[in-house]
């Protein structure tokens, strides 16, 4: 994500920024832009840094930059992170010091986690970045199962639709290493060209079960090689609806490729809206807090809330003073 504009200077500044915030209790992603723009906030954070290399970056490098070069250096970060944080939905999620959703707990207890990453709601880049962050979090929490005995690890199934939108190195790690931690990955996408080359190689090099429905001729050439001699490119191109070719991995050995029929979408089935509403309501009560509360906390943390509160107090004092003057005037008139 942002690979086309990701340079060594951007990475250097962003890395030291994040390492600095990690040493500050209660820090969030909102601190990335603030530490680069708010000098008082930056001094407060730097004073608590214990890592000499990170501290040296701010004292001996960043603070000694000329303003012109400093603006040039931080502008790409402010642009990219600012775009991400400008969405109220995302800002309210990543602007909280502690998440109310524990993915490791969900994995160990067999909970269901559904994430809506609709591009229409949060934008394409934001959807990709947030999705990549969540998938990486699943990967890290799966790897943390190293402190569990293998027999105690429960299978957890991660389903990712249109996974090319979130394709990062995490996929390669999950496919090659996370299976021993019982994180099972199911991915779906429309055509191979959507995947970066390294991700494509990791997918076809590590995936156990491969299912293909009707594809274009370019994809058919590649996928038919994965299925072996039994399936030719025209077979994949000419498939009808609700049919597929499938290859399984059984006892670490690939099965013979076979064709299968799938079920079409059920007709006339209406979703139970009342039950859906109940599930959402219970989930909100158990795992979330009111949006207004979160936004007020973020406002106060940013310093804007304090200014607004101070302005309100000033107005209140001025109003009270006017009332006192008016009251005194009335008394004089009565006399």
Residue ranges and their predicted role:
Residues 115, 213, 260:
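Hydrophobic residues at beta-strand termini and immediately following loops
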Residues 1-183, 199, 236, 240, ...:
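P-loop NTPase motor domains
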Residues 174-256:
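Conserved ATP-driven motor cores of ASCE-family P-loop NTPases powering translocation/secretion/packaging/pilus
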């Amino acid at each position: 994500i942002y690979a086309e504009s990701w340079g060594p200077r951007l990475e250097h500044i962003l890395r030291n920024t994040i390492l600095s915030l990690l040493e500050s209790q209660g820090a969030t992603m909102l601190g990335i832009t603030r530490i680069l723009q708010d000098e008082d906030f930056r001094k407060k954070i730097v004073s608590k840094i214990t890592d000499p290399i990170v501290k040296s970056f701010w004292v001996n490098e960043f603070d000694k930059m000329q303003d012109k070069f400093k603006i040039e250096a931080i502008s790409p970060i402010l642009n990219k992170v600012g775009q991400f944080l400008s969405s109220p939905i995302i800002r309210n999620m990543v602007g909280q010091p502690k998440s109310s959703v524990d993915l490791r707990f969900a994995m160990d207890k067999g909970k269901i986690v559904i994430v809506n990453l609709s591009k229409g709601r949060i934008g394409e880049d934001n959807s990709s970045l947030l999705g990549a962050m969540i998938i990486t979090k699943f990967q890290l929490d799966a790897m943390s199962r190293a402190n569990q005995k293998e027999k105690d690890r429960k299978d957890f199934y991660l389903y990712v639709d249109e996974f090319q939108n979130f394709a990062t190195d995490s996929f390669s790690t999950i496919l090659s290493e996370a299976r021993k931690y019982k994180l099972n990955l199911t991915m779906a996408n429309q055509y191979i060209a959507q995947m970066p080359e390294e991700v494509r190689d990791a997918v076809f090099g590590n995936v156990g079960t491969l299912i293909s429905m009707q594809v274009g001729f370019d994809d058919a050439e590649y996928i038919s090689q994965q299925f072996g001699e039994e399936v030719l490119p025209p077979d994949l191109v000419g498939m009808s609806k609700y049919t597929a070719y499938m290859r399984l991995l059984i006892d670490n050995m690939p099965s013979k490729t076979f064709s299968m029929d799938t079920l079409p979408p059920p007709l006339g089935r209406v979703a139970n809206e009342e039950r859906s509403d109940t599930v959402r309501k219970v989930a909100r009560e158990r795992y979330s807090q009111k949006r207004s509360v979160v936004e007020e906390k973020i406002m106060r943390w940013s310093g804007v809330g304090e200014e607004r509160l101070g302005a309100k107090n000033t107005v209140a004092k001025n109003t009270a003073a006017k009332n006192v003057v008016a009251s005194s005037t009335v008394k004089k008139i009565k006399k």
